[in-house]
Amino acid sequence: MSHFTKKSDFMKNIHDDISDIYSSLRKMQSARDQLDDLESRLLDVKFSKILELSKRTIKLIDDTEFKLISPKQKTFQDVINFRNQLDAQFLDLLSKVDGNVPPITSGEMTRYKDLKLEWLKIKTGYDQIVSNIQDINTKLIESSVPFISRGGE
């Protein structure tokens, strides 16, 4: 396999991980919006277990999101104030690999392995979120919670 092919495959792996991170983020952010809406509709005490799990899941989403991106960054100057998170570190590595002439350096490979391990650790939080959402959906069905509220009743 040529150095250019190895570099291309390596860059594809990095790109796939970045795509996986952003896909997971979109799903978590959508789930958080839905859970926020659900909480506003479940004010009855009989739904307290659902609400508790929902609140824990939102907290887990917030914590996981913060490890992946810097949600507080709003302008280019915020890079100074807020630490780059995993997405920016992957993008930085991709940029460095793309800008270098093959072969891939051992430092780039080591950095990728470190970032990949970090992503896999963080992904356990995402997996727990998915599991919590399945539990919430089961509890909603068991509790006969109406899918569409009747205007805040």
Regions flagged by a language model, labelled:
Residues 1-96:
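Extracytoplasmic/secretory ectodomains and luminal regions
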